[in-house]
Structures are given as C-alpha cells and as structure tokens.
Amino acid sequence: MNPLKRSLESSSQEHEAGKQKLQKRECQDFTPRRYQLDVYEVAMRRNTIAMLDTGAGKTMIAVMLIKEFGKINRTKNAGKVIIFLAPTVQLVTQQCEVIEIHTDFEVEQYYGAKGVDQWTGPRWQEQISKYQVMVMTPQVFLQALRNAFLILDMVSLMIFDECHHATGNHPYTRIMKEFYHKSEHKPSVFGMTASPVIRKGISSHLDCEGQFCELENLLDAKIYTVSDREEIEFCVPSAKEMCRYYDSKPVCFEDLSEELGVLCSKYDALITELQNKRSDMYKDADDITKESKRRLSKSIAKICYCLDDVGLICASEATKICIERGQEKGWLKEVVDATDQQTDANGSRLFAENSALHMKFFEEALHLIDKRLQQGIDMLLNSESGCVEAAKTGYISPKLYELIQIFHSFSNSRHARCLIFVDRKITARVIDRMIKKIGHLAHFTVSFLTGGRSSVDALTPKMQKDTLDSFRSGKVNLLFTTDVAEEGIHVPECSCVIRFDLPRTTRSYVQSRGRARQEDSQYILMIERGNVKQNDLISAIVRSETSMVKIASSRESGNLSPGFVPNEEINEYHVGTTGAKVTADSSISIVYRYCEKLPQDKCYSPKPTFEFTHHDDGYVCTLALPPSAVLQILVGPKARNMHKAKQLVCLDACKKLHELGALDDHLCLSVEDPVPEIVSKNKGTGIGTTKRKELHGTTRIHAWSGNWVSKKTALKLQSYKMNFVCDQAGQIYSEFVLLIDATLPDEVATLEIDLYLHDKMVKTSVSSCGLLELDAQQMEQAKLFQGLLFNGLFGKLFTRSKVPNAPREFILNKEDTFVWNTASVYLLLPTNPSFDSNVCINWSVIDAAATAVKLMRRIYSENKRELLGIFDSDQNVGDLIHLANKSCKANSLKDMVVLAVHTGKIYTALDITELSGDSAFDGASDKKECKFRTFAEYFKKKYGIVLRHPSQPLLVLKPSHNPHNLLSSKFRDEGNVVENMSNGTPVVNKTSNRVHMPPELLIPLDLPVEILRSFYLFPALMYRIESLTLASQLRSEIGYSDSNISSFLILEAITTLRCSEDFSMERLELLGDSVLKYAVSCHLFLKFPNKDEGQLSSIRCHMICNATLYKLGIERNVQGYVRDAAFDPRRWLAPGQLSIRPSPCECPVKSEVVTDDIHIIDDKAIVLGKACDKGHRWMCSKTIADCVEAIIGAYYAGGGLRAAMAVLKWLGIGAEIEEDLIVQAILSASVQTYLPKDNVFEMLEAKLGYSFSVKGLLVEALTHPSQQELGAKYCYERLEFLGDAVLDILLTRYLFNSHKDTNEGELTDLRSASVNNENFAQVAVKHNFHHFLQHSSGLLLDQITEYVNRLEGSSMDKVELLSDGLPKGPKVLGDIVESIAGAILLDTKLDLDVVWGIFEPLLSPIVTPENLELPPYRELIEWCGKHGYFVGINCRDQGDTVVATLDVQLKEVLLVRQGFSKKRKDAKAHASSLLLKDLEEKGLIIPKNASKTEQFEKHCGSTNPFNNLHVDAMDTQTPKPTKEKNAADSRNISDPLLGKPLHVIVKTSKGGPRIALYELCKKLQWPMPTMESEKVQPSFSSVCSSPGGSSQKATPQAFAFASTITLHIPNADVISLTGDGRADKKSSQDSAALFLLYELQRRGTLQLQEV
C-alpha cells in the first residue's frame, strides 16, 4: 500500500482523538504529504490562499504554520497570538480540537454563545496573556477589533477557514477592509478554501480570473493550488458522481392549492376582523396582528411548497407540524420575538384569540388535505408496490419516490451513512417523518439537521451538535440537512451524498460533494427528466469547477495581483485614547443595543424610530431615541439612498452617545460602577456570604481593662451593689459589691435582670454606690478571697508540673506566680445587708478566706505536708469534731462551707455518718473487688496522708457544681434528671453526688451558705454585664448621643442566633435592611435626577449588598463586637480564676487583634463562633454584614430615621438627604408633566384621601413607559423605585412594632407576604387604580382585563390563586401602587408618617401570624421535614411549559402530583398545593387557623429526634449494640431492597448513628423512623473517686433512658426494636438507631462501616 495514502480508519481515529479534551497533553505528530509540504513552504514565504479539495488536509497545513509561527513568537518573546477564524461555531469547535491535539500551545475558542460580546478590555487581556492560539468566529474578532480590545499589532498570523466567504459585507471582508489594509504592521495571512468562486459560477476565463483577483486583493494573498494532482487524487477519496432522473409530477393539485389559498384569505380576514373589534388602537396590538397574518401566509406557503415538491402526504405532515408547533405555542414565541415584545403569551387575550384562529386554520387545512388521501395510507407505504401506487396518485412526488428507490438500493444498510441536501428546513422535517412511515426502510435510522435560530423549523446549536455526533457514530444512517452541513463538517464515514435539491453555485456543488469522504462513495444529483434548466445549471457548475481548477493550477506564481484599492467610502468615528472605532455599517446595531439597555417592561421595549425625508439628490434620516435616552432627536446628513442615510445618522448618534458618556472609550455600552473602590476591594470568593469563613478577633472591654490590681497602694474604685431576691421564701442570697476602676454605663449601673434557676427565679439588681477606697492590705485580702472562691468552686486550686512525679502546686502559694489578666479586672466582694446606697463589705468573711489561703500556703510550702494535722488532740471530747485547723461541735457542722486540703475543692457539710476512717472502703458498694480495705488506707496510698483521727465519723458533703446558663428560662432545666409532673414530660437532671470525707482534711471557711449561693449567679450575671458594657462601648464609638438608643438594643443587634439567647439580631436586621434600602433610595433618587430606574437600582444594589456592608463593617471593626457563640458557663472566667478548660490558640495569627489580611478557610467542619483563649474565632462573612444591618435597625428602632442616618454616616454610607434636592425634584415634576384637560385624577385623590400639592407627581406616578411612544417625556419607573423602598420600610416597621413577640423567621414570612408585587397588584384592583393608568399598550390592557376578571370572579385568596398554576397579576399593577407611594412621599417632602396614614387603610387587612399563609412549596417542605418525610422533585421542560412532578412517600401510600407553569418556581408551587390538599384530605394537615410557627411547634415541633443533629454531634463514643439486642422485635420481616447492599458510613460519635439513618432514609425515600424514649432503672453504681480524688459513695442516678425505634418500610415491612439504656435521651436514641442499622445490614439492605 502506498504510504502516502492514509486509511479512512486512521482518518476517523484522528477525528475521534480531536474530540478529547486533554488538560496537559503531548502533541500528536503526523507525517505531511508532499503537496501539504509544498503549500506550507509557499505559505511561509508569502500570504497564501490554499485552494485544495475538501478532505485534502488544509487544516493540517494550518497546524504546521501555527507550530512554526508559534515557535517564532516564543523565540522572540513577542507576546503575539495566532488568530484562527472559522465562519460557524461547529467549525470553530472542530478546528480548536484539532489544534489542541497537534500542538503544545494553549488554545481557546470564542463565539457569541460564550458571552464574549459582554467582555471588557481586562478580560480580553487576560485571554491574550493566557492563550497563544485563539480560534473564533469572524464576527467576534471583528467586534473585538472595533472595540480596540484586540489590535492587529499583537497578531502574527491570521488563518481564514472557508475564506471564499470574504465577499460582500461578510465579517471577513470587514476585518480586511477596516483594519488589515489600514494597518502599518500587518500579520501574515493564510486562507483555506476548496472553491474561491463564491458566485453561481464563472462565465469565462476572464470572469474566473476576476473573481480570483478580487479574493486575492481583499485577503492580500495569492491563490495557490497543486499543479500535479496525482497525489491528491490518490490520497483524497473522490466521490463517484452520478445523476438520478425522476419523472414529472403525474398529478398537480392546483385545485387544492386554490382551496388552501381561499382558506388562508378567509382566516386573514378573520384576523383583521378580530383587530377591528377592539376598542383600542394601540400600536403593539396592530403589530401583533400584522405579524400574525404574515406568519399565517408563511405557513400556507410552506404547506403548498411541500404539496408541490414532495406530495400530498408530506403536505399533510407539514400541516401537522404547524399544528404541533401551535400546541406548543411555538408560533406565539415567533410572534413575540418578531415584534420585539416580551409579553407572556398567556397574559394577552389578543395572543390567545390569534392562536385559536391559527389552530382552526391548520385543522381545516389538514381536513382539506386528508380528505384527498385514501384510508389506510400507512399500510400503503409498507410495501414497494404501495409506494409505486402512492407516486402514481401524487401522494408522494416522483422526486421523493426516486429518493426512496435510492435508499432501497443501498447494500449493507446497517453501515450506510448518507447525507441528503435539501433547500428548505420544512422539506428536511417532512421527509424525515415520511421515511419513518415506510415499512421497508425501517432498518434505517433517520434524522434531520437544520441551522439558523430565527425559525421554529431550525434546531438549537446543542441539538445540531448531538445530531451530527449521532451521524458520525453511525447511530443515524440517513441525515436530511440544509446547507448548514455543506462546509467543513468532518464525517469520514459518509458513503453517499444526495442532492435532493440541486446546488445553486459552484461552491455549494464542490462543498457538498466533499462531504462524501469514504472510499468508493457516491455523489448523486437528482434531476427532473427533461428539465433543460436543471441540466444546464449542472453543466455550467461542472464547467465552472473544471475551469476554476485549471486556471488556478496554470497561474504563474509570479503573477501577483495588484494591491488592494478601496472601492467604497468607509465612514467611521475613532476614539483617540483607545483606538476603538465605529463605522457606518456597525453603527445601527450599536444604536439598537443602546436602546435595549434602556428601562423597559413586558409591555414596552424602547426602540429607535427613523423618518426619511426625500430630497432631489438624496435622503435625510431623522433618528428619534426613547425619552429615557440621553439623546432624543438627531438629524443625519444627506445620503444617496435611505439605507445609507440611516447608517450615517446612526454613526452621528454613536458619536454623540460617546460624548455624552452613554458609550465608553471602547464604544461599549457604559456600565456604571457606582462604587468602584468597593468592587475592587471586595474581590474574592463568597464575600458577604455564609460560604466564606473568616478568622476574627474579639474587641476588649475598655472598662474592664487595667493593671490596678497589681498595685501595692490604696485605691479608690467605683462600687456597684448587687442585690439578689429569690421568688421562693427562705432562699437567701448574699449581697455583693462590684469594684472596678471605671464608671459603668448608666444602663449597666442600674441593671435589673432575672436569673432562672431550675425551680426558682432570682431577681438581680445593680446600683451605683460611688467611690470606695481600699487600702493595700484590704486589696490583698480581697484578691485572695476572690481567687480562692472562684477557683475552689469552678476551677482548681492545684496545678501539676509537666515534670514526672513532681508534686502538685497550690496556685495561690506565691503572689508572683498567679498573675491576673489585665484584659478583665474587677473584684466581687460580699457585703453586709443594708437598705441604702452605702456599702459595708463583709471583711470578716474575706479575712477568713484569706486565712484559709495562708494556711494552705503553709501546708503546701517547702513540702511541709506533715503540717496537715495542725490541730491535734488524742481524744475525742464529747461531740467535738476535729477539723484541719480547729475542733467544733457536731451540731455546728450543718451547712458549714469547707475547703478540702487535699483536693482544693469547696464543699458544704450536710450531715455526719456512722462510717469512720476505719470503715470498709467498699462497704456501701456492690463492686466485688476493691483496691483499698478502709478509708484510712485509701487516703494513705492515694495521697500519702495518715489520718490522725481515723475513728471519728465521716462527714457527708455536698460538692460544688458547674455553673449554669441562668439567662434564659429555656436553660432552667439544663443538666437535671427530674420529672416535671405538672405536664408529665420527663426532664433530664443530674442528681447531686454526696461525698464522704474525714473532717480532719477540711478547713472551715467561716462564710455563710448564702454567699456560696450568690457565687453560682455570677457567671451568668457578669456575662450579661460584660455583654452590655461591650454594647455600650460600641454605642460610644458610633458617637450618636441619644438616650433612646439603649445598650440592650445594641446588644440585640450584635447577638446572633448561634448565641441561643432569648433575643438575636434577626429582627433588627430585617428592620435595618428596610431602613438602609429606604435611605439609599431617597438619596439616589434626589442626587441623580437623570438616571433611570435601572441605573438607580444597579447603584443601590452595589451600595446595600452584603459585600459592601461587610467591607464597611470590617473598616469599623464591627466583627470584634459580634457575639457569635452560646454562653458556656464552664469556660467563663472571673479575674483571678484559672481555666480548667483552656482552648490554646492555634490560629494563624500572632496578636489578639486580627489586623493583617483576613484569614479564610473552606473547611466545612470548622466550628463557628468558638473562641480560643486569645479571643480568635471563625465567623461567616455574612454575619458581619447582617450585624451592620442590625445596628442600623437598632438605631432606627430606638431613635428613628435621624439616628439611623447617623449610623450610616459613621459606616461611611453616603445617603445624605439634602432639603434643596427635594425642592428641586418637586419642581422638576411640576414642569415636565402635563395634566389632562378634564382632571380625571380628582377621583383618585378622593380614594387616597390626599390632595397633591404638585399634581404632576400623580400624573407621573400613573404613566406607563409605553406612553413614551406618544411623546411623553416621563414614566412612573423612577417613582416606583422610590415607592418600593417606601412601602418596604413602612410595612416592615409596622410588622416589627405590631408583633414584638413574633420570632424572626415568622416576621420575615410576614414581610414577604406583605411586601410583594402580587399583594400590591390586588390592592390596585381593589381600589381601581388601574382605571387611572396612562398607557399605550393593547397587550397590557388585555393582561389587566384578564387579571381583573379572574380576580373578581374567584372566591379564592391570593395564595390559592397562585398555587393553582394561574398567572400572577401584571407587574404594572403592583408598580403603580409603589409609584403612588413614592409620589406622595415626595409631595410631602419625605414625611413617612403621612404616607403611612394614607396607605395603612389601602393595604388593610395586613397579614398577621394568625392568617399567614406560607408559599405552598415552602409549607410542604417544612411539613415533611417536621414529620420525617422526604419530597421527591423532578422538573422538565415541555415546550414552553415547565412540568414539576413532586412526590411524598407516606408510610402506606405514595402521593404524586404534577404542576404546570411557565416558571419552575410556579410549577413547583402548583404541584405542592395539590399535594397539600391530598394531605389535608387524609387528615394529616392541621387546619389553617393558627400561625405556621404555632402549628409546627405545637404539633410536631421537637418530637423528631433527627432534627438539628449537628448540635448533638460530640466526640463521645456510641457503644455498639450488645449481642442480645441484635434480634429485632419486628413483624412481616422481608428484604425491602433488591440488588447490591448500600454502603453506609456511620460515625460512632454522639449523633452519628442518627445522622447515618437520616441519610439512608433520605436516599431511599423512606419515611423517617419514630422514636419513643422512656425511663429505665439502672444498676447501682459503685463507689468511685471524684475528679479531685476524694472518696465518695456515689448515690445511684434516679433513672436512665432507653429508646424504641420504629421504621416503616413502604410496601414492605415495619421494624421495631429497643436500644440499650443510656444516661441521656439522645444517647439512647443513638443506640436504637445503631441497632436498626445493624438489623438492616443483617437483612442485606446495607453494609455498615464504622468510623
């Protein structure tokens, strides 16, 4: 075999390889043929147009050039790129893949669908620096050159694929004429074509030479082809050309064509009559009518064409296609697109009526056609003889019959690959359907391929690609296509090309023939027998090709064409700074694009209008732009024809738009960047979102800071008395005084707060007592008292060295070893009771504690542990009990507070036992084995202590306990195991342990138990005081002096939900959001009177978005004040207290304050809010933005708009409202608007109860943008922008103040239900505002009329109307309500109270929690989530309609419903409403007579053990099921699943089994299992050591919990089993869940993996 001849198999493999995207590839080598090398060498010497046969490898020559030029670019480091241009997207993609495979360059493709038209200069520069080869459509390159994003100086090589397109006004032509021939530094040019002749053919040698020269001159290149064609003819498969002749039509259906014409005229008249019946004469309605008639005419033309060309059956199929398209409302989409309207077709009566007429026409037309067809036509086509009969009767045309015969002649049909070229898209579609009906061709797979986007007969780009891929792979045998597949499409396996419709040009002939790439392939021309015209056409084309090849190969290489001589005058406008330019040719599209960016709605699209004036020697065009444009009227220069006049006036307009700033210096539409500094600094992923996690520090409280505690001199400190009053008689709490070296804010100094203990409440009050002086000795005693009590109760008094076997150290042993933290310094000292503001510190108690500290120092200094028995006596005297430092009577021990010298723990003595040191250590234990015989032996071996009085009785002590969160009533039951018998609900509560201890190890502290009680209140109390002080500190930083802005409001604003307080920032955030929106809207409205609503909205969006608020908050250190973690009393530290739960700082920062670059993390497992010991904590970026809004809301709630504006100023948000701008805006409205002659608005003013001072504001508020077509210079959109913010703040303020006890979630729902366009639309209809709307749109009138009729004729409420799938109200109705609100606000000079007084009755009844209706989809999701069900969702497109299928698997039945709508959201709402009705019918949905929150909380709020699992997931291990529990107590056991078991990973940490079970049920759509937990009596616990090491006889817990789990497997089984008993309810539920998982594993449902 000749090595030059590549097999078709290798060619196919090359193409398939080209389809693979390799991220980092090694370029594939190929061996070029001799003629390819020849062309390559010529192209390296000069600009060349390679004229080679299709399939000859022109692209590979281009690849060789790319390699060489790329190498040069790299060597010279010139930074130049190579541009490869291809005329279609398919070719761009195909060629890009080939270049990627065969080169090592970075290659990218560019076309319009990628959005490159919207790219900016920096984006293009990024592409240039990243890629060396850029493959693109010529229009993309042309536009980038015109915008000066790319310049030819940066291009080293331009490749033109299918360069014969460079004629007329093609982008190839524009690139060369506008840029290349004017450039000083021209890149090299390489063109590729199989036919340089673009016209029908060539008439002579001179004509051919002229067309060659024209192309050469334009591309500045020389045509080159191979003179010796032997190698090409050998290497490139050449299709065998043949003609198939068909007979003339035996039957002409002229009478049927006439009948169809008459029918079309009839319906044309009906459409006209339909329009004449309308009372209005709106232009858009006229446009719809005209377009509808035009479409009707086009449809009948298609049907008649099919009737004449392919026969009666195909005409019937064409009619059916029209009917199907009408059913999908495809024709309506065409009408909408053609008239540049964006109206929802369902929203216009005119659309519906026209649609009905079209459908009736098609049905009648089909009836006329089908009655000519005999019964059983489908059976007729199942045989060859039937097809012959069909041809004779005209059912199929002879031409189509001959095509069928060709198909029938194919051998090895399963591998046949045939392209059939037709002229029209409808032909491809109907023949495709026809062939599928023919039985003896059923072994073929048939499809069609059509291009373009303007027709509904065309395929989308994706469908085109999929169809071509199917044809290439052999899934499709017969592909009917238009000329879209003529050029460049690589199908190496194509064995036959049929020209069902003859080619019209030499280029079409050559290109289509070149698609037949297989060896021995065929190229079949179908010609009517005896048709001289067709024969002459083919003969001329063949002669043209022969002459073209001959002339091209015989031209001498030295015979260069003359240089390019421009034969047209190019009018253009240049921008000197960038080099961008616009030509007269491109100016029209720019003007249209500019108008498209102007404000518009569904019933009005701004467009330019052109008027032409004829003069003797030409035309003058007057351009009128919409009133919202910066330029309205422009008269252009005179031109020779109307088109040129239109171009020139648009060119002048582009120049003016650039001068006025509407076009930027790149002649792109100006996109305003209102806050560029914000945008530039906010670059990053997820700024202001919950996805972004950042590390921030905590702001110190200035009032707490200081080093005064270390001074050895007398001090004067501010004193604040703390008084505690319990609501239970006999419960006494000692008074205390807070001493601090700063003056606390008044609200803190007068604080009153309720602290919630388990079974009681303590009212706490703080009062200022002025300065109090302490001498140096008192300071020392006070510090010892505080250090002893807080460490002895909540911490530890001993530390152990890291040195092995080193003795413990007493932390108060040396003054210099225990340093107080200067960040938080204060003293809490007990006082004697007093009834005035005087403070009388109880120094006797303080001195006693200090004495105990000194005693402990003596005991633990210099290893003098023998001093333990300081007080010694050989005999017990009477009822004396020997303590560590004294003896006392037994009856005085009750409630004595003591300190254990060996553990450093503080206890309260309860009783004397009968046990002694000599008693058996395990005497009260059921434990079989024990290490110690007696208590005395235990203390000797454990602590090295020899009891001096082993015979004296042991004391029963109550140990100190951990502090609790007492700030909220919801925490009062935290940590207890008792049963609340009032409601029968078991509440977890740990029973207090009782400790047995020898008295001689105890030091009495001589302080009453009342003082000890007060100490347990301090963690919660001081946490609240610290928080309020921090909030007050932030208030001071803001600097607005208003006593109404309380610290409590500020505290609420900086507290997140994660804190689990009774309050959070959510409500204030909602209010602040509305306030911010209102303030910024007013500011922008007044400051920019010439900006339209779209521009104002864009600026507002930038100013109030979370990214901006985040940036401003960071600049003001708001993040340091945010409270983002729940109060953990065990980690709270008093001054002088050592932490027993440290959290060492491992953060990537050195200082406490994060001042450098913000650290970001993507770890989803990161714990938010929890601070390390230096105060660093991870926080969501959005939290900071939310806090900013909440602070604004707090100031508005406390001090009104003036206070909120002060916060905005402090933040740096420019939202000032100047009085003179208000006056100017009112004056402008009064000047530019006009009043109707009869004042029709008096009735509206009467409805409003308000008379406008400036009537023009009301006129503007009711003027629709469509009025601008009649000359109006204004519309309601700016006032709508203002009114939107007005109604938002008014309704939010009302809801905030009216529902103070409503939680933040429900408040958000209330606002959403109140502030929305549908609600406002109903208000407009209720008060007949629509009667006063000034507009010029028939479509809008139809929409409003239909909506009003539906609303008035329905008894359903708003939610039912929406959820039933009916369209929402026209947006314009809600808009005018907002614009009226904006007009009144402006007329009253921004008096919100007046506006509310007018609108409150208009908006009534305003939604309340009692009648709040959640959106159906939201309600369904929440209900299912609460009850343990999952919602299956599947959405698909069906024509222009979205079909949403939702299903809910209940325990016994699967509920499935479908919803339909134009939008996915509305379709899901429709389906959800139907499912909710089903659930209600089954009695599962609660009647809607209460708020949603109350319903859910009451009926299913906290019963689901699988809710909030992440809260319970802790690092505690979940035991495996015991062996005796593996057997399940179940009924009807069967394997619920078939197939391979699911792999389930279960974490053994707390919550892990429940999470795994939840994920399993969600995946399988099983209802969540139910849990029932009950008390169980555990075994008696053994005697054990306390954490401090003391011996204790542990009292058994009152009970533990065991949980029973029940799983309903749909249509299969019910499994019920009980887990092991656990100490708390959640752990017992984990045990039950784990048992169930193991049971499912036993059944083969899953395979468990524990981690």
UniProtKB/Swiss-Prot annotation:
Keywords: ATP-binding, Endonuclease, Helicase, Hydrolase, Magnesium, Manganese, Metal-binding, Nuclease, Nucleotide-binding, Nucleus, Repeat, RNA-binding, RNA-mediated gene silencing
Ranges of residues in domain DRBM: 1413-1481
UniProt: ATP binding residues: 52-59
Cofactor(s) for this UniProt protein: Mg(2+); Mn(2+)
Feature type site, description Important for activity: 1371
Domain Helicase C-terminal: 402-563
Gene Ontology MF term list: ATP binding; helicase activity; metal ion binding; ribonuclease III activity; RNA binding
Sequence ranges assigned to domain Helicase ATP-binding in this UniProt record: 39-214
Residues reported to bind Mg(2+): 1280, 1375, 1378
Tissues where this protein is expressed: Expressed in roots, shoot apical meristem (SAM), leaves, panicles and seeds.
Subcellular location: Nucleus
Domain RNase III residue range list: 1031-1200, 1241-1389
Coiled coil: none
Gene Ontology BP term (one): siRNA processing
Motif (DECH box): 161-164
Residue ranges of every copy of the Dicer dsRNA-binding fold domain listed in the record: 587-677
UniProt EC number: 3.1.26.-
Chain segments carrying region Disordered: 1-25
Domain PAZ: 879-1006
Family according to the record: Belongs to the helicase family. Dicer subfamily.
Subunit structure: May interact with ARGONAUTE1 or PINHEAD through their common PAZ domains.
Protein name per the record: Endoribonuclease Dicer homolog 3a
Organism: Oryza sativa subsp. japonica (Rice)
